[in-house]
Every structure is written in C-alpha cells, then in structure tokens.
Amino acid sequence: MNYVFSTEKTKRYRFPTHINDLVMDRSEATSSEVFVVVLAPGEAPPLHQHDDTEQIFYVLSGQGRLEIGTESQPFPVAPGDVVRIPPATPHRIHCVGETSLTYLAVDCFPSGRPQAEPTWDSHVKAVCAVQGWEYEQVVEAKGGAIK
C-alpha cells in the first residue's frame, strides 16, 4: 500500500481542453484521488458536473475564472486560492492569463470509490465516451509514460 505519492512521477492525460497529471489513482484510496490540472492560456474544460464527487482545488500558478452552479458572476482564482466544488454542481475553470493555470485537484467520494468507475482509466474512458473524444489520443502518446 502506498502512503506517499510524487507529483514528479505522474501519468499524463492530454484532453482536447486541458491536461491532467494523475498523482494518486482512486484505486489506491478508499474515497479520493489526486491529480494536477494544467490549462494553457484560453483553455477551459466543458461545463460539467460530478454527481458522486466533491472536488477541492488548490491553485498553484496562473490566473483563472471559475464558473459554478447558478452563480451569474464568475469568480477569479489565483495562486494560493482553494476552490470547493460541491457534488452535482456544474462548473468549469478558464485560464485567463498569459501563462498556464495549474492547480492540484483532490476528488473526494462521499459514498466511497465509484463502483462504475473504480480506476482513473475507467473514469477517463467514460469521460471520452460522453465528450466524443478518442481515449487513445487522450492518453499521452508515449503510452501514458511517467514524466
């Protein structure tokens, strides 16, 4: 069982809208997972929600704009900010600066690890199916090699 995970040795997933570097797979924990998100200037993932997940983001670098729920005004995010996304809440973050927006994301599963998607790869395959993305193109060209 692993207790310490390196942010230097990650598996990279390059979605059409952002990068996720997997730090701790949900299969290695009871009810959480950890990854680093990188958005290039102008990038934003699609508006989406996670019905079974509460997310916590810690902004490491860059500038962003959070759209969340039914809020009419977006929220600015900057290094040092912590963002909370409640379960079943539509959200997305835009990179609005001239440099990449990078944040550490911790997904917490209040009901335990999702049975339908027990690993990060199974989750990525489901996301790709919903968005119409090719899984093989999302996994880093080097086969998801450790960076």
Roles of regions detected by a PLM:
Residues 36, 49, 60, 68-70, ...:
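Residue-level recognition of conserved beta-strand positions in structured domain cores
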Residues 34-38, 56, 74, 82-84, ...:
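Conserved hydrophobic/aromatic beta-strand scaffold that supports enzyme active sites
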Residues 35-51:
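Conserved short histidine dyad/triad with adjacent acidic residue
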Residues 79, 87-114:
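Ligand-binding loop in jelly-roll beta-barrel domains
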Residues 44-46, 65, 73, 83, ...:
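Histidine-centered metal-chelating micro-motifs
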Residues 54-79:
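A short beta-strand-loop-beta hairpin characteristic of the jelly-roll/cupin
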Residues 1-32, 46, 118-147:
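A short, N-terminal "cap"/entry segment at the start of jelly-roll beta-barrel domains
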Residues 19, 43, 52-53, 71, ...:
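A generic "binding-loop/recognition-motif" signal
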